[in-house]
Amino acid sequence: MTLSYPKPPLTDGTVILRRWETSDLACVEEASRDPRIPQGTTVPAQFTAAEGLAWIERQWGRADNGEGLSLTIADVRSNEALGAVVILFRQQPGTVEIGYWLIESARGRRLASHAVALVARWALRDAGIARVQAHVEPENVASQRVLESTGFQREGHLRSFLVFDDCRADAIVYSLLPSDLV
C-alpha cells in the first residue's frame, strides 16, 4: 500500500497540510534547536542549510518509497510552515503510526490538534487505512491531550518501548479506528 499527497491539500480553515517545500527551511532550522524534536524524530540536531534541505528531500521520499507520508503543518493564511505531521506504515497491514511536532512559536494554539484530526480522518475515510496509532511518553501530557481531543482512545502502557539516544522509555499507546469517527 502507498499513500499519495492529498489533492487538494487538507485544510480546516486554520491549518493546511501540504507537501514540504524548500522554502520551509526556517521551520526545520527552528525545530532543530528544540532538544525534544531531534531526539524523537529525524530532524537534524546539528542544523546546516544542506542538512535541512536533505531532511526535506527525505520527507518527499517517504511517499515515493511507500514508507508513508510527511506533511507540513502550515498556517492557512500565510502558508508559513509551523511543524510536521507524519503517518508511517507499520508491520500490521492497514496500520499507520502518527507523529507530529510544532515549532515553539506555534504552540498553544491547538494547531497540532487540527493537523492530527485532519490527517487521521483522511487516512481512515479516504486512504483505506484501518488503524491510526500513536506512542507517547507518559510525561508528554501535551501530546496526550492532542490525541484525546481528536478522538484517539488510550489503549495501554508499554514499558521500555521507545528508544531515544540509546535510552529506553515507556510509551502510552493510543489508536483511532474508523468506528471511532463521528
Regions found by a protein language model. Name each.
Residues 1-35, 70, 74-182:
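Acyl-donor (CoA/ACP) binding surface of acyl/acetyltransferases
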Residues 32, 41, 63-64:
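Hydrophobic residues in alpha-helical segments
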Residues 36-58, 69-71:
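Conserved GNAT-fold acetyl-CoA-binding loop/helix
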Residues 51-54, 66, 101, 169:
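A generic membrane alpha-helix/interface feature
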Residues 58-62, 122:
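A generic secondary-structure signal
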Residues 61-66, 152:
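Short loop/turn motifs at secondary-structure junctions and domain boundaries
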